[in-house]
């Protein structure tokens, strides 16, 4: 049986939704990489009683390792270390060497500021140097150190800011206390297949057939997720079950080969970036308001291939900035394939790009008609050599869903156009 772990994300700001939890999913992925089975992720506020209740719950579940995030700062509500010490039956002691290292960090952070009472600041941060007796101290990335408290279960206490937590994790997994806690781990492999254009019901039917027909199917742990209009199929298995996974992959290829765009977990964004090497792209957007160009420029190095973008929401902007004929809009409507094609052609010329993508649609909640209901979106991908692809789709969901899914459709149309050479 594999080692099991639980995660406690602390912080009232996370519990109430003011701050999105980024640590829980990140730690979950790292545990998976280590071959540790994740039993629970819990979120609680800053009250010590609530934190201790979560610790006791996970201990009762029989986990070997508990990972906490948050509550390591110098303020009054940062009480995770003290709570963990009490839970583990350990006395808090002042680590004078750690206190000095924290003071050195504070001195560097303050620099030449003369308006700060350094002694008062140091005193306020002294609580960060109080650690459970017998714990392994993890060097601070900011000012807050982490600790590993050995026991049954072992508790790893990490800071809340991801920029501090993630580097500290790499140190934590090298400690003897943590490695001992997960010594019974089972090595797993994980593979991800991504699909686009296949409804969840179609995949569900295939997986039901696989469960019935594939020998050893029960050795695969499969999770599916619909994200940005794409299907993600994540399969986790022990190494000797690889032939079973290969048989599943063959079945997926046979039934849904045209929908599969990634078998190695790569995103369509990664693929488009690679395909644009040596080329330049321009975008012309209406209903998405620049979301496609934002997505294209999320990746470092995108300046090598993104030539420019035009957001033309009003019809007049389409005419003035992209040269879309006014009579074309009058004859076909702003949401039409002819107008999308003219927008792409205008972007291609204005920015001197090799390829252009245009989006025009009705995101809602108003503006729809019987012929063009809310969710109707028209796309065009035009190449400088004259090749062109146009498409009209009707996307489900609210305004936000339609806009986000529109960018995904555009990325896949672009991917296919670039793959065709």
From Swiss-Prot:
Stored InterPro entries: CinA, CinA-like_C, CinA_C, Competence-induced_CinA, MoaB/Mog-like_dom_sf, MoaB/Mog_dom
Cystine pairings recorded for this chain: none
Domain of life where this protein originates: Bacteria
CDD domains linked: cinA (cd00885)
Recorded family membership: Belongs to the CinA family.
Protein name as catalogued: CinA-like protein
């Amino acid at each position: 049986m594999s080692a099991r772990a639980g995660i406690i994300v602390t912080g009232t700001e996370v519990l109430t939704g003011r701050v999105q939890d980024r640590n829980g999913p990140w730690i979950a992925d790292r545990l998976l990489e280590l071959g540790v089975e994740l039993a629970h992720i819990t979120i609680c506020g800053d009250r010590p009683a609530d934190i201790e209740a979560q610790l006791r719950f996970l201990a009762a579940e029989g986990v070997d390792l508990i990972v906490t995030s948050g509550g390591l700062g110098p303020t009054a509500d940062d009480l995770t270390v003290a709570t963990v010490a009490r839970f583990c039956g350990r006395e808090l002691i002042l680590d004078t060497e750690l206190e000095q290292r924290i003071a050195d960090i504070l001195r560097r952070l303050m620099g030449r500021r003369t308006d700060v009472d350094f002694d008062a600041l140091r005193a306020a941060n002294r609580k960060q140097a109080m650690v459970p007796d017998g714990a392994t101290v993890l060097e601070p990335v900011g000012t807050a150190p982490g600790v590993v408290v050995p026991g049954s279960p072992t508790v790893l206490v990490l800071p809340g800011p991801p920029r501090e937590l993630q580097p500290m994790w790499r140190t934590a997994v090298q400690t003897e206390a943590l490695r001992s806690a997960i010594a019974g781990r089972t090595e797993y492999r994980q593979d991800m297949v991504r699909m686009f254009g296949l409804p969840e019901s179609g995949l569900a039917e295939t997986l039901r057939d696989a469960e019935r027909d594939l020998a050893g199917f029960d050795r695969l742990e499969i999770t599916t997720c619909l994200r940005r209009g794409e299907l993600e199929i994540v399969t986790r298995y022990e190494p000797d079950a690889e032939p079973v996974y290969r048989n599943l992959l063959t079945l997926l290829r046979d039934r849904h080969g045209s929908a599969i765009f990634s078998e190695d977990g790569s995103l369509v964004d990664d693929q488009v970036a690679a395909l644009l090497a040596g080329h330049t792209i321009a975008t012309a957007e209406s209903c998405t308001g620049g979301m496609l160009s934002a997505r294209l420029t999320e990746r470092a190095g995108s300046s090598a291939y993104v030539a420019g973008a035009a957001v033309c929401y009003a019809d007049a902007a389409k005419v003035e900035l992209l040269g879309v004929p006014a009579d074309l809009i009058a004859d076909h409507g702003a949401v039409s394939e002819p107008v999308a094609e003219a927008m792409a052609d205008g972007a291609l010329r204005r920015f001197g790009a090799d390829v252009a993508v245009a989006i025009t649609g009705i995101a809602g909640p108003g503006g729809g008609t019987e012929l063009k209901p809310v969710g109707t979106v028209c796309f065009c991908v035009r190449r400088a050599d004259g090749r062109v692809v146009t498409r009209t789709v009707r996307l489900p969901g609210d305004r936000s869903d339609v806009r986000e899914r529109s960018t995904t459709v555009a990325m896949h149309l672009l991917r296919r156009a670039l793959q065709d050479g």
